[in-house]
Amino acid sequence: VLLAQNAAGGGVTALFTPNESTTFGMLLALQKSNLAGKLKFVGFDASDKLLGAVEAGQIDALVLQNPFNMGYLAVTAMVDHLRGKSVPPRTDTGAQLVDAKNLSDPKIQELVKPDLAKWLGP
């Protein structure tokens, strides 16, 4: 109700949600309030439903992480640390902004639907 009132009066023009569950919850609230696609909406992480909402124009963009890269860099840093090498205090594992224009890009598709057999074997 508060969202609908603020959006109707021009008080809310854009939204950002910081994880998959809040992004999905906000999408449901916007759909229920008939505001989906009427406000700028950027979320974080992805699911099939959220990607469908990007494709449908109900979410403007999603920020995606690269779980494989996160794990790989973490293990590499730990191995380096155990071998006595210097390890940076922070490591940027990367993020990718996904919108309707680049959703079908092969690099984006690899993030949202990784070929697990490639890494885990048959």
What are these language model-derived features?
Residues V1-P122:
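A residue-level marker of the well-folded mature domains of exported/periplasmic proteins
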